[in-house]
Amino acid sequence: MVNMKASMFLTFAGLVLLFVVCYASESEEKEFPKEMLSSIFAVDNDFKQEERDCAGYMRECKEKLCCSGYVCSSRWKWCVSPAPWRR
């Protein structure tokens, strides 16, 4: 009886240890692509998009006018593409 309890305990402890090791290695692998992508797509201050004088698609149009090709929705106050029934 004692040997069976000890072997079950050791088996359970081994499975827990295996789970912890696998989880740790998987979390390290997940960080690597994030770091690589962030270094590839790092945006320099010179290349940042400048603030426009007009609001683009699905942007609020309360204070800014919509860019060309968009109209301000009277209901939602967003810039949307003009629909045929609105003309």
UniProtKB/Swiss-Prot annotation:
Single GO MF annotation: ion channel inhibitor activity
Keyword set includes Ubl conjugation: no
Cystine crosslinks: C54-C67, C61-C72, C66-C79
Keyword terms: Disulfide bond, Ion channel impairing toxin, Knottin, Secreted, Signal, Toxin
Subcellular location: Secreted
Source superkingdom: Eukaryota
Gene Ontology cellular component annotations, sorted alphabetically: extracellular region
InterPro entries to which the protein is assigned, alphabetical: Huwentoxin-1, Huwentoxin_CS1
Tissue spec. comment: Expressed by the venom gland.
Pfam families, sorted: Toxin_12
Propeptide: 25-52
Signal peptide limits: 1-24
UniProt main location, coarse: secreted
Function: Ion channel inhibitor.
Entry's family note: Belongs to the neurotoxin 10 (Hwtx-1) family. 51 (Hntx-8) subfamily. Hntx-8 sub-subfamily.
Domain remark from Swiss-Prot or TrEMBL: The presence of a 'disulfide through disulfide knot' structurally defines this protein as a knottin.
UniProt name for this protein: U3-theraphotoxin-Hhn1j
Species the sequence originates in: Cyriopagopus hainanus
